[in-house]
């Protein structure tokens, strides 16, 4: 099972948190991997958050507008983008030119776990934290020395 950050919470995290993995505590992918005995292949990218500058995720605005109910998103981002400038919401935009680098990690396996362990919150949290930790270390390596919009030195 390939795990790549990309939920609403991850996609629209603020620019200054672009080098942080934020899966929003969502553990469904871990539950599925444990239940099916499937490995998780972590994937991360550096540079995609330079194509659209998110100033704020807009969690409070999304709650106020109840976007989770009608848009299935918990965010209403405040962004700086071309051609609109400063915007609120999910308008189409022209991505800024940015070098994007993607890395795939080694599969993460838990052969000692049984399908029934997928319903144990402590097991889910431990496995989730392991995946997030691996992904964060991968992103740290990709981001080291990176200059926004210019890519690697």
Language-model regions, residue ranges each:
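Non-catalytic C-terminal accessory region of glycerolipid acyltransferases
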Residues: 1-153
């Amino acid at each position: 099972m390939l795990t790549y950050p990309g939920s609403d919470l991850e996609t629209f995290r603020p620019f200054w948190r672009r080098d942080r993995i934020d899966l929003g505590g969502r553990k469904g992918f871990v539950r599925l991997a444990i239940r099916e005995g499937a490995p998780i292949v972590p994937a991360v990218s550096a540079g995609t958050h330079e194509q659209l500058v998110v100033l704020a995720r807009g969690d409070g605005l999304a709650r106020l507008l109840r976007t989770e109910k009608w848009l299935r998103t918990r965010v209403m981002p405040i962004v700086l983008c071309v051609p609109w400038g400063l915007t609120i919401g999910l308008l189409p935009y022209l991505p800024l030119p940015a070098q994007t680098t993607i890395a795939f990690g080694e599969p993460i396996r838990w052969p000692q776990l049984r399908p029934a362990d997928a319903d144990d919150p402590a097991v889910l949290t431990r496995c989730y934290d392991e995946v997030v930790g691996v992904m964060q270390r991968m992103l740290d390596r990709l981001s080291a020395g990176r200059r926004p919009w210019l890519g690697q030195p």
